[in-house]
A protein has these predicted regions:
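Intrinsically disordered, low-complexity Pro/Gly/Ser/Thr-rich segments with frequent PxxP/GP/PP motifs
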Residues: 70, 74-103, 186-213
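Terminal connector regions
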Residues: 101-140, 144-147, 212-241
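Beta-sheet-dominated interaction scaffolds and their linkers
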Residues: 23-49, 85, 143-155, 194
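Surface-exposed binding patches on compact interaction domains or structured appendages
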Residues: 23-26, 48-95, 177, 183-185
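Short, solvent-exposed loop/turn segments enriched in Ser/Thr/Gly
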Residues: 36-42, 95, 108-111, 158-160
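Bacterial N-terminal signal peptides
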Residues: 8-18
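Asparagine-centered strand-capping/turn motif at beta-strand->loop junctions
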Residues: 45-49, 162-168
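A short beta-turn/strand-edge loop motif at beta-sheet boundaries
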Residues: 51-53, 168-173, 213-215
Length: 241
């Protein structure tokens, strides 16, 4: 959908000869970890453009739909942001303060801050391209926290999925997934928009096979990288649900 919107804007610009203008905004940090018991922090938005810009800052609860890891956002009042709207002069920065109203008890709480650039008034012959940035927040629970990701393979509808179930109470980040067959063939997972698997979530990665797929009786070698370190383990097929 985002790609379609981008192509539509480009087509409009080419068709009309309009000038495309986009403000350069940066945010720091790009990920916000809140340690056990921590309730307050801040982030900084900097306008690197040549004109004033306005932004709206909102917080949402963040969960994952089991399977593809799509970001699911829900309204929340558990994160307070100040200011919620800001005007930033060129070359200037705005500090946004964040307060967590409720600390999680048993499982890591996850949120996302959406920073939306507010478009300026319309100008003849000018298309303003506005920015949206999404910043993840990870709030550790009061109890001891860890990720516990278990992997297996499923065969369904002529394709193979690598399935990961995070039974822990902390998120994990998984990337660079490769499966090696018994005859040495390398099978890579299809790219995913998000590398995260949240606490209690299930993720699926489709495995692209250039030749024949491995047999369901075969055990494959999994290698990947995670926050907790390198992953190297054998994975087996189980009956698809």
């Amino acid at each position: 959908m985002a790609a379609a919107k981008t192509l539509a804007v480009i087509f409009f610009i080419l068709l009309t000869g309009a000038v495309a203008c986009a403000q350069a905004l940066t945010v720091f940090p790009v990920m916000i970890p809140l340690s056990r018991g921590q309730k307050a922090t801040s982030l900084t938005i900097t306008n690197k453009g040549t004109s004033e810009t306005a932004v709206q800052i909102r917080a949402y609860g963040w969960s994952q739909k089991d399977g593809d890891g799509d970001i699911q956002l829900t309204a929340t009042n558990l994160v307070a942001l100040s200011p919620p709207i800001a005007r930033i002069a060129p070359g200037a920065s705005q500090v946004v303060r964040l307060i967590l109203r409720q600390t999680p008890e048993k499982r890591e709480a996850t949120y996302r801050i959406l920073i939306d650039q507010i478009p300026p008034p319309a100008e003849p012959g000018v298309v303003h391209i506005v920015l949206r940035m999404s910043i993840p927040i990870f709030a550790q629970p009061e109890v001891r926290s860890f990720a516990d990701v278990q992997f297996h393979l499923e065969r369904k509808d002529g394709q193979i999925d690598l399935v990961a179930i995070n039974a822990g109470n902390l998120h994990e980040l998984i990337r660079d997934i490769v499966l090696t067959t018994s005859d040495g063939r390398k099978l890579k997972a299809e790219s995913s928009a998000s590398p995260y698997i949240l606490a209690g979530a299930t993720r699926r990665w489709h495995i692209a096979a250039q030749d024949s797929l491995p047999l369901s009786s075969e055990t494959l070698q999994l290698t990947a990288h995670a926050n907790s370190g390198a992953i190297e383990e054998q994975v087996r097929f189980v009956q698809a649900q």
